[in-house]
Amino acid sequence: MNNIFHTIQALWPEYTKSDKKVATFILDQQQNITNMTLADIAGEAGVSEGSVVRFLNKLGIKKLIDLKLSIAKSAEEKHPAEGALSAVVEEEFSDVVHNTASLMDPERLCRAVDLMEHSRQVYFFGVAVSGIAASTGENSFIRMGKPVHAILEGHMQMIAAAGLTEEDVVVVFSLTGNTRDTCEAAALARQQGARIISVTSYVNSQLARISDVVLQTFAKEEIINGGRITGLVSQLYVLDCLKREYNKRNRARTVRLKEEIGKAILSKKV
């Protein structure tokens, strides 16, 4: 397939006024298109949804998902990795940590820990790569004496959400904030009265809109390279901030518990 950005520019003389608005928006906001709906694009470009559909047809594209895939492929061609592999990875990881740190709001962080500290029980929701962050969070907080349950599958998340109350908290990990199963479970938990803390890159996402506290990550979910772990690194940075703030507030208890855990683990070594 031809580079979609080149195709958009090559057809410029044939565009109507509405086409040019859509084309300009796509070229300017290509990094965000993969997380937008047809209605989002139309609204931001200042045209009707029908105008967006007609524009896509001119490109030979029938569905929005095909545009998103084309953009993801073309972006990869546009920004190939350069230099030694280890240096490229180091730069990517360094950038994502630095940028996530710049987005961290201390007041929101403290508010999130307040909710967790005074809750009856805490659940961590996440699927796929975000599930790794949720599972890591469970392990971290249990070691500090805070009962946390990580649920990594959508059906089980719904079951857990149905039994929550206003005394409970759900921490939801989702880079896009629009993962269907997780968002549905979070919405049900909110309906039951539970407080929602979201860890997401998109503060205007479906998940963020129903959250009591939003802790923003920097990494974007990629369609083509969804296996990259820079998104996970960003989530783990936020998780570690939560853990350290909780530990600071409960140091006496967590120190004693860590000593007991250390003894228990050492006793299992051969």
Whereabouts are the PLM-identified features?
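A short, charged, Gly/Pro-tolerant segment at domain boundaries
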Residues: R249-V270
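Glycine-rich phosphate-binding loops that contact phosphosugars or nucleotide phosphates
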Residues: E117-Y237, K243-N250
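Short amphipathic alpha-helical surface patches that mediate protein-protein
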Residues: L27, A72, E117, E259-K263
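Gram-positive cell-envelope targeting signals
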Residues: I4-I8, F141
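HTH-adjacent hinge/linker in prokaryotic transcriptional regulators
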Residues: N3-F5, P13-T24, D28-N35, A39-R111
